[in-house]
């Protein structure tokens, strides 16, 4: 393999960072992004304060700082126990950094060039492919999003039932 050619997964990770972090149109290289994008953007929104805290102690507005963030991605899988949750945390973190650098074109472009490579190495290409690659990640995200929607719907129906009970009790008390 030519050392100057990046693996397809790296280009796809760059696309995820662009679609999720920079709100660019979904990446043309892989049509499986929608559930992945929904998961990552939801995680970015829900855990924004956590990601902000992670960046608070790093001077990431430099190429050295961006490289430090990439090295920190490698630590996520340092114990050899990769799973989809960790993989998504890495992808979300890279997307969050891209978002934070969106108004600094040179640093953003540098981050989009190097962080996908770090993410690729952190997730581990063999691990990723052995678990179905992008289709496996899409299936995981779809499953988690479906469970979340199910819990939200259960909570919504429970709230509606409670409201109906209260309204019925109020109506009965007026008779």
From Swiss-Prot:
The keyword Signal does not apply. The keyword Transmembrane applies. Its main location: host cell. Residues 37-42 are annotated as: Mediates interaction with human NOP53 and localization to host nucleolus. SUPFAM superfamilies: Bcl-2 inhibitors of programmed cell death. Pfam families: Bcl-2. The chain crosses the membrane at residues 153-173. It comes from the Viruses. It is a single-pass membrane protein. GO terms for biological process: regulation of apoptotic process; symbiont-mediated suppression of host apoptosis. PROSITE patterns: BCL2_FAMILY. Keywords: Host membrane, Host mitochondrion, Host nucleus, Host-virus interaction, Inhibition of host apoptosis by viral BCL2-like protein, Membrane, Modulation of host cell apoptosis by virus, Transmembrane, Transmembrane helix. It is found in: Host membrane; Host mitochondrion; Host nucleus, Host nucleolus; Host nucleus. One of its GO terms (cellular component) is membrane. Belongs to the Bcl-2 family. Plays a role in the protection against apoptosis mediated by cytotoxic cells during the immune response to acute and persistent viral infection. Contributes therefore to latency establishment. Also plays a role in the inhibition of host starvation-induced autophagy which ultimately contributes to the viral chronic infection. Also participates in the viral genome replication within host nucleus. Interacts with human NOP53; may sequester ORF16 in host nucleolus and reduce its antiapoptotic activity. Interacts with ORF55. This is Apoptosis regulator Bcl-2 homolog. It comes from Human herpesvirus 8 type P (isolate GK18). The gene is vBCL2.
